[in-house]
């Protein structure tokens, strides 16, 4: 008997808009050495291969920190830090080159796998590495010579784009050469950040030990503006102690995400390398799974347009069937669309409300208030109310009223008071359904 899964079909359909949206988009992925050493790394590679097959243009930047620490311990070589950056002398550089070369080969081999009965079957991915990044030395700081520790000087964006146009994956590490033919040890997060900026990437994705950025209660912060992310980073830096004075992977990635967004990269994502499928869930679901640092919110509050009617109908139809909202036909919505305000997220209408002015009485009705079930924990109802209050003020109206059967307490929390039918505009009084017995509430003094 064949196994049938409607969940698979549903998930496939829900991800379709994101498949279309991400096709031909450039994504820079930061893979720290911790992610490479984690047992989940094989699944991460499988997911990256899936993104490649879906038409995303992928650049991978890998790090070597834990592998380097292990090798330094084995060789009993000391490589001190200055201001969070490892000082790379000649011997340290040779060890970095050894580890970076080994990881490059290991990652390339993993991406080249095409065994049957595995997610990589038939993938045939071309992995390209090269001298796309030109480095320069950090020099001397406070009398400390960084030796072969360096920074990005130049990036061959044309060369990288040629490889990406051929659907190859570009793989780069923390070692880059200079115009003088020397090698330098770079911070992998800085390499990834500069690549995202100079390639005009659509996304920068960092794999961390945590599932994104957490607040003080340990809850995931789904979305941050750069200014908010900076405040969190400053708080985390203040919590560092002399015994634990180095930035964590999450802090390093967050720092890169802030820089990338400020420089024009639309979205930077921080997700866990321990969570199986985190990359797919972050990119192909409405809410994602980690934290994204965004130039602008992915949610937009705006006036509804005729093209939004389908989304509004999808939102309000379940509430109409439950009797919570009065049924509206498509034709009625087309006539009233100018009255509606919506909150949109990634093309999905997640909340709506309409404003019906009664200028003779100096009042307006707030009607057809609906919020998608997945988004009712936030303050979107308050956002819509404030937007409609502003509109009512523009119309020189002084009162806002609602008719509700289920949300009496919520409206009272917002300052509405319960009144009887006589307080309604005359036209509305004539249309009041006494069988429905909706509660009438008024907000005065807009």
UniProtKB/Swiss-Prot annotation:
SUPFAM superfamilies for the chain: Acyl-CoA N-acyltransferases (Nat), Carbamate kinase-like
Coarse class of the protein's main subcellular location: cytoplasm
Family: Belongs to the acetyltransferase family. ArgA subfamily.
Residues in N-acetyltransferase domain copies: 299-438
Presence of keyword Transferase: yes
Top EC category: transferase
One GO molecular-function entry: L-glutamate N-acetyltransferase activity
NCBIfam families referenced in this protein's UniProt entry, alphabetically: N-Ac-Glu-synth (TIGR01890), PRK05279.1 (NF003641)
Pfam families reported in the protein's UniProt record: AA_kinase, Acetyltransf_1
Pathway membership, UniProt: Amino-acid biosynthesis; L-arginine biosynthesis; N(2)-acetyl-L-ornithine from L-glutamate: step 1/4
Record's protein name: Amino-acid acetyltransferase
UniProt entry tagged with the keyword Acyltransferase: yes
Top-level taxon of the source organism: Bacteria
PANTHER family in the cross-refs: AMINO-ACID ACETYLTRANSFERASE, AMINO-ACID ACETYLTRANSFERASE NAGS1, CHLOROPLASTIC-RELATED
EC numbers: 2.3.1.1
CDD domains according to UniProt: AAK_NAGS-ABP (cd04237), NAT_SF (cd04301)
